A protein has these predicted regions:
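N-terminal Rossmann-like NAD(P)+-binding domain of SDR-like oxidoreductases, especially those catalyzing
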Residues: 1-92
């Protein structure tokens, strides 16, 4: 079993990637900052299904915070990092 880190795990793509990895028998650590750019209740709903899985754990953290990011990586090693965290719908 490989341990995956999935950032942006409460988003649509992140939650579905995490679910697929769990179905394939892997351990998944999810990170998301649960910002209010769009409904945090929707993000928490997606997380609720993942949190029911025994091989899933979640850390609420902002990857823009260097200390929080360092803590995620110092807590345990990962075989694979899937970085999906982003500000959705940003237009400049």
């Amino acid at each position: 079993m490989k341990r995956y880190l999935v950032t942006g795990v409460a988003g649509f793509i992140g939650a579905n990637v995490a679910a697929a990895l769990l179905r394939a028998g892997h351990e998944v650590v999810g990170v998301d900052n649960i910002n209010d750019y769009y409904d945090p209740l929707l993000k928490r709903y997606r997380l609720s299904a993942l949190l029911a899985e025994s091989h899933f754990s979640f850390t609420e953290a902002d990857l823009a915070d260097a200390r929080a990011t360092q803590a995620v990586f110092s807590d345990r090693p990962f075989h694979v990092v899937i970085h999906l965290a982003a500000q959705a719908g940003v237009r400049y």
